[in-house]
Amino acid sequence: GFSLRRGPEPLLNAHPFSSLNPDLVLDAVESTGLPCDGRLLALNSYENRVYQVGIEEAEPVVVKFYRPARWTREQILEEHSFLQELTEAELPVVAPLVTNGLTLHNCEPFLFTVFPRKGGRLPDLDLDTLQSVGRTLGQLHSIGARSRFQHRPRLTVAGHGEASRRFLLDNDFIPD
């Protein structure tokens, strides 16, 4: 890990990404051995921060900064391993780049990953496409069932469906 050009420390109750500025993003990417050309574009992301970063004389990369204290190193590495397994099975996913022999890098207080930039689009929702999406999801689940994840939380009906429903009902979020 490293810490360059970070500026003032964030306030105690500041947003988890308050110290993530453009200089820090570029420094983080360059710490992996990739020479940045200064281009930086923030991309949509729900809970993390994701950027497209220009690389000198190469295609841009996509860099994902994980929300501090949300995921452990072990959980992220388990996800990376699964993405690699899916890639080897020729599923249409994007596995992280290995830079400096690693897929997960540290720039305190952030863990981050570099991905190749891959284009995509929303699928047409015709019957053939829906069947293809269904087959792909089936393959994903089949590959995922080969080994038991040790660190990632399990998505279950009881834990994510019933518990969420109970919370909404118990706290009057759903009108009568």
Located regions from the model:
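Residue-level recognition of alpha-helical structural elements
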Residues: R39, D126-T129, D176
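Conserved beta-strand edge residues that scaffold enzyme active sites
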Residues: L43, N100, H151-R154
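ATP-binding pocket architecture of kinase catalytic cores
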Residues: I55-F149
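Conserved NTP-binding catalytic cores of kinases and kinase-like/nucleotidyltransferase enzymes
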Residues: F2-L97
